[in-house]
Amino acid sequence: MQYIPFLISGLVPVALSKSLFEATSNTRIDGNDIAAIFGPVLTPEAHIFLPSDGDYDDNVMARWSTFNDPSYVATVKPATETDVQAIREYQVSTAASHNITFFATGGGHGVKLNFGNVQNAINIELSLLDFIDLDLDNEVVTIGPGVENAQLYDLLSSVGKETALTGERCVNTIGPTLGGGLGPLYGIRGPQVDSLVSARLVTASGDVITVSRSENRDLFWAIRGAGANFGIVTSATYRIYDQTNGGMAVSAQFAFAPAVNRSVFDLMESMNDEYPPGMSGGMILSYNHTTNEPSVQWNLLFMGSNEDAQPWLDKIQALGPIDSSIRNVPWHRRDEPEVPYCERGQHYILYNLNLRRTDAATLQSYFDSFVDFSSKNPWFDCDLMYERQATDAALAVPLSERGVGPWRDSKINANFLVVTPSEEYDEAADAFVRPFMDRFQAVMGFDTLHVYVNEALGDEGPASWYGEENLPRLVALKQQWDPENKFGAGAPIPLSL
């Protein structure tokens, strides 16, 4: 697999039991009734698709991963905010008697254990809400939940602007914001939530409200890091900025012989205390089952001038890469394949850890075991994506202005992206990955578990996603805005402590 250094981005404390891998089902509603139920309350532009329709797969977005994925009796594609509100109002008034579960889908990239418990649901797919309203006078842009990064990247670049986005062009824009949002501008603009000005939200009661620093301020704090727990966002407004370095970046990819892996790890460790704000990316450790050899790569994107990037490029080139590419590219286009994050329908499992430092010896221990395990198990495909991020901009925001997203001091966002042929291999893959996550956490982690909620598997616990100190406030808001726990299936806020 190719490495993508910026994710839509954890010790997982217990092994995955068989029960966690098995889904439970709700009482099934007849899909043929869905059109009769929702047809009268939706606008003509909205669509309803049933799995029995011959064109269902052509019209309904496939999820990125098949791991513990939800199942649906129907997909409703609202065309307006009014449609979303009507669906929610129906659930409030009658869904309990029909035992209907609803599941909102923005980009479908989330991978969570508990999604497997969402069965026979109605999928609210938001892809038709793909509007963009650019307001240059006020330096903001408002978008719908169906917008993908590529649409916003290209529009902003055409007018000399930027905002903090995740890295992949194919990924939904609003979805990652709700969990914080890491991307190539993190060291300069901070996480996505720092650029969020306001949002329109359909709540569990079916009301449509605005959340911002001046309206529903407490809820605005909560949706900036725990947003999936409080409703369906129907639009979001972001602050925009003049492009960094005139919109040009230095994109570099390096490949190394496996024998020099320790030198690569040592270099990453040397960056524990110094890292430029404009640089993002990191190492990818993988295994090629065709050549039966491991792969060591270092990919980076430097949002700045060639002169500022060169000292850092020199450090990497001094290791003697066997292949390299260094180019100037427009920031919004990128310069590398976006597989795997743009390839849907594979059996991906994603584990995440946020770390405070790098320890080369720990990485070496993992690499040696990983190569041995991969060589003996041709079904096992895993990328360790080890991303270094500058914390300057994120930590500069005053505490009173921050959202709930807690781990601004994390220097490393580490992801184990596992691909297996099918679910029968999940537990064996899990048994290999977990001990190394324990080791990473013990040696390179914080005193408490830090997990980036967008990339969390879902069994780590709310303290690891949202911060122990934030839970009392979050629980109170959950009780106020979603007392029946309709939202947040993947990384839920509890209704009590």
Swiss-Prot record:
<comment type="pathway">
    <text>Alkaloid biosynthesis.</text>
</comment>
<keyword id="KW-0274">FAD</keyword>
<keyword id="KW-0134">Cell wall</keyword>
<feature type="domain" description="FAD-binding PCMH-type">
    <location>
        <begin position="68"/>
        <end position="243"/>
    </location>
</feature>
<dbReference type="GO" id="GO:1900781">
    <property type="term" value="P:fumiquinazoline C biosynthetic process"/>
</dbReference>
<dbReference type="InterPro" id="IPR006094">
    <property type="entry name" value="Oxid_FAD_bind_N"/>
</dbReference>
<dbReference type="InterPro" id="IPR012951">
    <property type="entry name" value="BBE"/>
</dbReference>
<dbReference type="Pfam" id="PF01565">
    <property type="entry name" value="FAD_binding_4"/>
</dbReference>
<dbReference type="InterPro" id="IPR036318">
    <property type="entry name" value="FAD-bd_PCMH-like_sf"/>
</dbReference>
<feature type="signal peptide">
    <location>
        <begin position="1"/>
        <end position="17"/>
    </location>
</feature>
<dbReference type="GO" id="GO:0071949">
    <property type="term" value="F:FAD binding"/>
</dbReference>
<dbReference type="Pfam" id="PF08031">
    <property type="entry name" value="BBE"/>
</dbReference>
<dbReference type="InterPro" id="IPR016164">
    <property type="entry name" value="FAD-linked_Oxase-like_C"/>
</dbReference>
<comment type="similarity">
    <text>Belongs to the oxygen-dependent FAD-linked oxidoreductase family.</text>
</comment>
<feature type="glycosylation site" description="N-linked (GlcNAc...) asparagine">
    <location>
        <position position="288"/>
    </location>
</feature>
<comment type="function">
    <text>FAD-linked oxidoreductase; part of the gene cluster that mediates the biosynthesis of the antitumor fumiquinazolines that confer a dual-usage capability to defend against phagocytes in the environment and animal hosts. The simplest member is fumiquinazoline F (FQF) with a 6-6-6 tricyclic core derived from anthranilic acid (Ant), tryptophan (Trp), and alanine (Ala). The trimodular NRPS fmqA is responsible for FQF formation.</text>
</comment>
<keyword id="KW-0732">Signal</keyword>
<dbReference type="InterPro" id="IPR016169">
    <property type="entry name" value="FAD-bd_PCMH_sub2"/>
</dbReference>
<feature type="glycosylation site" description="N-linked (GlcNAc...) asparagine">
    <location>
        <position position="261"/>
    </location>
</feature>
<dbReference type="InterPro" id="IPR016166">
    <property type="entry name" value="FAD-bd_PCMH"/>
</dbReference>
<keyword id="KW-0964">Secreted</keyword>
<protein>
    <recommendedName>
        <fullName>FAD-linked oxidoreductase fmqD</fullName>
        <ecNumber>1.-.-.-</ecNumber>
    </recommendedName>
</protein>
<dbReference type="GO" id="GO:0016491">
    <property type="term" value="F:oxidoreductase activity"/>
</dbReference>
<keyword id="KW-0285">Flavoprotein</keyword>
<dbReference type="GO" id="GO:0005576">
    <property type="term" value="C:extracellular region"/>
</dbReference>
<dbReference type="InterPro" id="IPR050416">
    <property type="entry name" value="FAD-linked_Oxidoreductase"/>
</dbReference>
<feature type="glycosylation site" description="N-linked (GlcNAc...) asparagine">
    <location>
        <position position="99"/>
    </location>
</feature>
<keyword id="KW-0325">Glycoprotein</keyword>
<keyword id="KW-0560">Oxidoreductase</keyword>
